[in-house]
């Protein structure tokens, strides 16, 4: 199932890339690409390595249902706090980066998808070894967003639909995930902020590892957009996406 998701991660961007570059101007596509790079960092913060540390916690607790519910609640609270911190950081970036400031509506809409990812609980389904849930929700999320993009995005005036449709796809995925949680009879129970803070400290090493290995992919785009026009971001981003797609195959 996870192999299927790996294929989907290649296919969906390759479907939208030629379409968006055709219907959007170079400048608008540069905005799309730059905000996407920013959101990759926001997503790293919100994930904070819980895909690894959270999965480990779920595996250790899966034979104790009450403890399992507590682990889910504690990690959820920690990720909500991370999302709040990421949003504050994003507001700071909007204040100092002209490209984001000029497209504040687009940027804030794009963050909605990052926030909704808090409620996807991939670490839980990995921990209980139900990988098919992760794959199905990903395909549903990206499939809906991709299909709606072809329907609603036809020119620069439709640019706000790009993050909005991503958010719609994510919302559908969240609903599907909560249906699966109900099937597992999981009721989320929050403990305390101090417990959530402990979860963050335990997961920091995984976050640092992820940051070191994956963050640099978007760093060049981030720096280019901070100092150069959106058109330069667009050209750079298209090249990097094509290179990334080829590298994924090997």
Language model features: what each stretch is:
Residues 3, 30-33, 76, 107, ...:
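Hydrophobic/aromatic positions within or immediately flanking transmembrane alpha-helices
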Residues 1-14, 141-145, 162-181, 193-250:
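Transmembrane helical elements of multi-pass membrane transporters/channels
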Residues 54, 121-132, 153-154, 170-192, ...:
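C-terminal transmembrane helix end/exit motif
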Residues 33, 66-81, 200:
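Interfacial transmembrane-helix starts/ends
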Residues 21-29, 95-104, 128-133, 139-174, ...:
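Membrane-interface helix-loop junctions in multi-pass transport and translocation proteins
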Residues 45, 84, 91-95, 99-124, ...:
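Alpha-helical transmembrane segments of multi-pass membrane proteins
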Residues 14-18, 91-92, 122-123, 146-151, ...:
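Alpha-helical transmembrane segments of multipass membrane proteins
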Residues 47-63, 243-250:
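Helix-loop junctions and terminal segments of transmembrane helices
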């Amino acid at each position: 199932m996870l192999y299927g998701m790996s294929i989907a991660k290649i296919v969906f961007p390759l479907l939208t890339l030629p379409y968006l570059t055709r219907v959007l101007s170079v400048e608008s596509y540069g905005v799309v690409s730059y905000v996407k790079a920013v959101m990759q960092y926001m997503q790293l913060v919100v994930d904070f390595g819980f895909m690894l540390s959270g999965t480990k916690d779920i595996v250790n607790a899966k034979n104790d249902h009450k403890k399992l519910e507590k682990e889910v609640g504690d990690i959820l609270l920690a990720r909500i706090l991370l999302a709040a911190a990421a949003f504050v950081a994003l507001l700071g970036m909007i204040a100092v980066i002209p490209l984001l400031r000029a497209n504040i509506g687009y940027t804030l809409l794009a963050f909605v998808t990052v926030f909704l990812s808090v409620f996807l609980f991939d670490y839980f389904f990995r921990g209980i070894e139900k990988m098919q849930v992760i794959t199905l929700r990903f395909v549903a999320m990206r499939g809906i967003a991709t299909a709606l993009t072809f329907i609603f995005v036809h020119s620069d005036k439709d640019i706000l639909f790009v993050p909005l449709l991503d958010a719609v796809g994510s919302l559908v995925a969240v609903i599907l995930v909560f249906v699966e949680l109900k099937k597992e009879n999981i009721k989320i129970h929050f403990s305390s902020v101090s417990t959530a803070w402990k979860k963050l400290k335990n997961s920091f090493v995984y976050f640092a590892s992820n940051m070191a290995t994956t963050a640099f992919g978007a760093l060049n785009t981030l720096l280019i957009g901070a100092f150069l026009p959106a058109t330069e971001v667009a050209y750079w981003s298209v090249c990097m996406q094509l290179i990334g797609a080829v590298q994924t195959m090997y």
